[in-house]
UniProtKB/Swiss-Prot annotation:
Pfam family, one: Glutaminase
Similarity-based family: Belongs to the glutaminase family.
Uppermost EC category: hydrolase
Lineage of producing organism: Bacteria, Bacillati, Bacillota, Clostridia, Peptostreptococcales
Subunit comment: Homotetramer.
Catalysed reactions listed for this entry: L-glutamine + H2O = L-glutamate + NH4(+)
Alphabetical GO biological process terms: glutamate biosynthetic process; glutamine catabolic process
Protein name, entry field: Glutaminase
Keywords carried by this UniProt record: Hydrolase
Amino acid sequence: MNEQLQKILDTNRHHIQGGQLPTYIPELSKANKEALGIYVADLDGNEYGVGDYEYPFTIQSISKVVTLLLALSDRGEKYVFDKVGMEPTGDPFNSMMKLEVVRPSKPFNPMINAGAIAVTSMIKGDSQKERLERILGFFRQLTENPNLQVNQSVYRSEKITGDRNRSMAYFMKDVGIMQNDIESDLDLYFNQCSIEVTCKDIAKIGRFLANGGVLFETGQQLIDEKYIKMAEAFMVTCGMYNASGEFAIKVGIPAKSGVGGGIMASVPKKMGIGVVGPSLDEKGNSIAGVRVLQKMAEDYGLSIF
């Protein structure tokens, strides 16, 4: 499989030039635009990696899937979805527009920034430190990587430039969606987005989802399968920002992207896939990464549709 993956990588590398590095978070603009890597972890225990699969990047919006699972596990679906909706928006991920004009005032889904911030605020813990430790511990379990850490430079950069997220959070407090100290909740959110990962790490998250919430190494049912199905449904409808519909048609795999250049994909009952390519298209998705996943879906018949 490595040979086939390498060929897919090589034939799609030229797409990198059509994208840009993000500039609104200064630290992310320092990424290697030319990096491109794939990692596959399947349910038979096989793992394959080609290209820059060890290239470190911050998880960014891919983290929204993980914190949604933790919040659902902590609070249950009624609590979570009373405060956050289930519908795609068609708007950019950092848009506030529908939050203000649509009634009732709640974020449309957990994959946009407003929804993800609200979800993070639901995670239990007696202190800020405990909540962050729970989030980090959960990520370490799902990636099977006990060494995951927050990239402090990116975290600081997110915090300094996070005024739009701040304004959304204060609006949500005003309408009763968020109750905690807003700066503490935002700090948690900036931390979770700044966790440094590789393709291998996010492929393992994808495999966890593909395995129905069962940890591959231990066989432990960590998260109820109904929550996994919800997360995968959100990945299909909202996971690739406002390119989710096109991605569902052309690729047909539940996936979640992040502006760090990562895409985490999960093929139910088959495999998890991690792709990195920091050069982004105008929607905020890895421009070469999307093409790589499209070719993989075609070659291996991975579409769920």
